[in-house]
Amino acid sequence: YNLMIRDGLKITAANTEKMHVLGAPHQFEFFVKRVITRFGDKPIALASDHSGFDIKKQCKEDTMALPYIDVGTFTNKSCDYPDYVLQVTKLIQTNECSHGISFCRSGQGANITANKVKGIISALCFDEYMAQHAIKHNCANHFSIPSKYVDKAKLESILEIMLNTSFD
């Protein structure tokens, strides 16, 4: 500050809700890629296996007012979730999408698969609390939703939380 004052710069103060102090280049990169970009700023990547197909369809038709890219599956015929979850993670890695949501029966398989991919922070979200904390405290960019435990009303509520929560 002394150098700034010496050079004639005026230092002022203002109240702020939160402040992020950045040090190393990797911290700045994390901030730009993950913190500034909020859920819904870019298209959301969607995927499901056969058991998550119906709730993904509801998500797209009834509750998703956001732009999205659906990578499949497109039927409720038996299929393997990793084939689709990995496509979602690729869209996040290439920055085409900022976040992804994968639907399967328990959410666990999609969550485990996504977390194996570099740069992906996936969280299992079966209620509003889990969704809020996944973003607020873990800066998650992928969400696994279990079709066995989440109905349409709960999904609407979870998506609303995701839209209105930011990383602290």
What is the role of each PLM region?
Residues 45-54, 128-168:
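C-terminal binding/interaction regions
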